[in-house]
Amino acid sequence: MSPTSVAIALPIETKLLTPLYDWGRRFDWSHVKEAHIIHIVKKNVTPLEFGLVEMPDESTFKEMVPTLEKFLRDEAQKILPPSFRGECYFHLSRDFSPEEEMITLLKKTNVSVVVVSTRGKHGLDGIFHSSFTDKMVRFSPCDVYVVRPE
C-alpha cells in the first residue's frame, strides 16, 4: 500500500539535504495527499558563571522563525516535484529533545511514513553517536524511510 501522507524531517546541513533531493526526484508522489515538512531546533542549556542559559531562548527563536520558515519553503520546492498536487504543511518548533518532539508531531499528524537523512556513521562513530535517525527507527509511530549521503 502506498503512503498517502509523508513527513520529511528536514535537516539544515547541505550534506544531509542532498539525499532528500535525490529521493524526492525518484519518489512516486501521485498517491500522496499530504506532505509535512518538519524542522525542530534543538534547545541547549549552557552553564555560565551566573547560571544556566537556554539557547536559543524564546526571543531568539522568534527572530529565527521567518528565516527558518523561508528555508522550509525553499527546501520543499527542491524536494517536492512541480507535479505534486497535495497539501503541503510546514512545522517548525524547538525542543531539548528534537527526537521526542518529532515523535509527538508524527502522532498528531498521523502520517504514513517519515523520511529522514542520516549522517551514515559506522564503526566506533556509530557506537558513540546516538542519532536522530536511530531514535526515529526505534520509536516512530509510522514507517521510517532512511536516505543516506553518498
Segments (PLM) and residue ranges:
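Solvent-exposed polar/charged
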Residues: 26-29, 107-108, 138
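Glycine-rich, Arg-bearing micro-motifs that act as flexible, cationic patches
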Residues: 3, 113-139
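Short, hinge-like loop/turn segments at secondary-structure boundaries
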Residues: 52-56, 107, 132-133
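Structural beta-alpha unit
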Residues: 78-114
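A short acidic, glycine-rich active-site loop
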Residues: 56-71
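Small/aliphatic-rich secondary-structure junction motif
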Residues: 2-58
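Short, flexible loop segments at boundaries between secondary-structure elements
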Residues: 139-150
